[in-house]
Amino acid sequence: MATTLNPSEISDLIKTRIEAVKLSAESRNEGSVTSVSDGIVRIFGLADVMQGEMIELPNNTFALALNLERDSVGAVVLGDYENLREGDVAKTTGRILEVPVGPELLGRVVNALGEPIDGKGPLGATQTAPVERVAPGVIWRKSVDQPVQTGYKSVDAMIPIGRGQRELVIGDRQTGKTALAIDAVINQKGTGIKCVYVAIGQKASTVANIVRKLEENGALAHTVVVAATASESAAMQYISPYAGCTMGEYFMDRGEDALIVYDDLSKQAVAYRQISLLLKRPPGREAYPGDVFYLHSRLLERAARVSEDYVEKFTNGAVTGKTGSLTALPIIETQAGDVSAFVPTNVISITDGQIFLETDLFNAGIRPAVNAGISVSRVGGAAQTKIIKKLSGGIRISLAQYRELAAFAQFASDLDEATRKQLERGQRVTELMKQKQYAPMSIANQALSIYAVNEGYLDDVPVNKLLAFEEGLHAHFANTQGELVSKINSTGGWDNDIEASFKKGIQEFKTTGTW
């Protein structure tokens, strides 16, 4: 006999089965890749994408949304794009790019995404921060009044740099720009200033050499190296300065001092130009996009000296009574000394001064090849140590007068005594400003050298023996007046007792004749 089912039983059975089915609904914003070329992906069908948002692609690859158009999104791939295909699924993440930050990064070499590339294992950093951030406002800033010693007599005496300043280092290729910046990093050993060195578009061998030199000089322990080498994509070179800045800001926000070197921003601008042209953005002067000024201004404005209130607010009261600072040394490479090109003029107008390095001076053996006439520090004077400020006033004047007189002396057959003395003093000052690479000088030694040349103690020393005399003088003071040297290095003060000690020590050394 056939079993008959009531319609109500059938209905109950269907309801039970429906209730037993477990469905989970997940809202996703997905699109599909329509083209991939030269590190740029075009994605159709993505809605509600934010400018600068991370877009997830297959194989754990991410892209950065830069062009938001009516029907599609133009994004730049961060990393390898060879495995991407037309039709691949792209998803929004709702996040912007973040990199690891913290003291765990000190002594490490990372790429633009904060991933370690030095073979020393994982970083162990527990915190991350977005690469793009609004610069501190006017209310949160403090004036620059503490020095950053570079260890170079010519810079610390004539073009002083303060904590929180942006000082441009500009010059042609092979004029010693990187050498100056690396020596400044080495000189921060023992000062408590943390350093970040960002290598943009450089040869990997050059970066490896810099890391080795930092390690040899004991400076890698307080330094983070961010490397986006020439072999990496334009996207990595474009974001690397922002990533490095974020790593430096970590220390500034917690009431510490940091120094960041961007080497160099010319290559970042070229990488950004490449990305912009591939995204079909309209080109402007020198084919750069219209927002290339903003590219650098939003980066360099993040370097600042911030107040105690800012640090206290940022740390929720964990750190009180301390100011923080991020000092920036951006480097720009010029072509045949043309500082009126687009990118150099932009960065000159953004920064608080510039150090011009000249090919002619470099080839003449004057290294660092600083042109004191057109180099300037707009805010660093307030940050100079007392002793250097007191003694260095005559240096710039001596050099300026020497250059003027040297030009006239070429046409004069005989010179009066005063002119001849000025020329000889200028020659000695120029010679004394020379300094070897990887040999930054302490405040006391700088002060001693400047005092000796200003007071005429070097007038009877042959020019070709000046540097040997200087080396011997420093060694003499270290042996006979070590306590005074330590006091000057720690306080930077100047008084009559120090002057008397300088006079006596220099005269004693000259009588020994051991130079």
From Swiss-Prot:
Primary location recorded for the protein, binned into one broad class: membrane
InterPro entries xrefs: ATP_synth_asu-like_sf, ATP_synth_asu_C, ATP_synth_asu_C_sf, ATP_synth_F1_a_nt-bd_dom, ATP_synth_F1_asu, ATPase_a/bsu_AS, ATPase_F1/V1/A1_a/bsu_N, ATPase_F1/V1/A1_a/bsu_N_sf
Function: Produces ATP from ADP in the presence of a proton gradient across the membrane. The alpha chain is a regulatory subunit.
GO molecular function: ADP binding; ATP binding; proton-transporting ATP synthase activity, rotational mechanism
Subunit text: F-type ATPases have 2 components, CF(1) - the catalytic core - and CF(0) - the membrane proton channel. CF(1) has five subunits: alpha(3), beta(3), gamma(1), delta(1), epsilon(1). CF(0) has three main subunits: a(1), b(2) and c(9-12). The alpha and beta chains form an alternating ring which encloses part of the gamma chain. CF(1) is attached to CF(0) by a central stalk formed by the gamma and epsilon chains, while a peripheral stalk is formed by the delta and b chains.
Sequence similarity: Belongs to the ATPase alpha/beta chains family.
Catalytic reactions of this protein: ATP + H2O + 4 H(+)(in) = ADP + phosphate + 5 H(+)(out)
Top EC class for this record: translocase
Annotated site residue numbers, Required for activity: S375
Keywords linked to the UniProt accession: ATP synthesis, ATP-binding, Cell inner membrane, Cell membrane, CF(1), Hydrogen ion transport, Ion transport, Membrane, Nucleotide-binding, Translocase, Transport
GO cellular component: plasma membrane; proton-transporting ATP synthase complex
Record has Cell inner membrane as a keyword: yes
EC annotation from Swiss-Prot or TrEMBL: 7.1.2.2
Topology with respect to the bilayer: Peripheral membrane protein
PANTHER family associated with the record: ATP SYNTHASE SUBUNIT ALPHA, MITOCHONDRIAL
Gene: atpA
Protein name: ATP synthase subunit alpha
Location in the cell: Cell inner membrane
HAMAP family: ATP_synth_alpha_bact
Annotated binding of ATP, by residue: G171, D172, R173, Q174, T175, G176, K177, T178
UniProt source species: Xanthomonas oryzae pv. oryzae (strain KACC10331 / KXO85)
